[in-house]
A protein has these predicted regions:
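Rossmann-like S-adenosyl-L-methionine
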Residues: 1-166
Length: 166
């Protein structure tokens, strides 16, 4: 099921060739490394240092050089990244509590062309989607990552609403 999720995200970010993608709450870098291995420029942000060490080691072992790893909170690093470069795609896979208000604010300030939100909690997903003004759901998929349990992952592909669409 993990490969299914990664392929889905890869299809959604296909238009991001040579453009910056942020993978926020990246964990050990699964999504970031999957995309970087296909030539995409990815900046992975994760607070848990051992996970970032694993991601760096995986990148080195697999000869992946188009992925940058930032250890620290999304609240800390995302504003710094968007102040330096235009972000085409923002991928967020937050913990069950969802995104903080400051992360939503940073997302909206960066005005990426697309946002991909992966969530394990339908309640916080709904709350956060409502706060992402200026974006429209383009596709949504439910993935049963943990068969025989009540847990699901929901992947949502949002595109920026262009002024002509308003």
């Amino acid at each position: 099921q993990t490969l299914r999720l990664y392929d889905l995200i890869d299809n959604w970010v296909d238009a991001a060739e040579e453009k910056t993608i942020i993978d926020a709450y990246s964990g050990s870098g699964g999504i970031a490394l999957w995309l970087a291995a296909k030539g995409k420029k990815v900046i992975a942000i994760e607070q848990f240092e051992p996970a970032m060490e694993d991601a760096r080691l995986s990148a080195e072992t697999n000869g992946i050089s188009s992925c940058q790893f930032l250890t620290g909170s999304v609240e800390e690093h995302a504003p710094q990244v968007i102040s330096k470069e235009k972000v085409h795609t923002f991928i967020i896979d937050p913990p069950r509590k969802g995104c903080s208000e400051s992360v939503i604010k940073t997302l909206l300030q960066s005005q990426p062309e697309q946002i991909i939100y992966v969530s394990c909690n339908p309640s916080t997903l709904a709350r956060d989607l409502e706060r992402l003004e200026g974006y429209k759901i383009h596709d949504m998929r439910v993935i049963d990552m943990f068969p025989q349990t009540q847990h699901i992952e929901t992947a949502v592909y949002l595109k920026q609403i262009k002024s002509a669409e308003n």
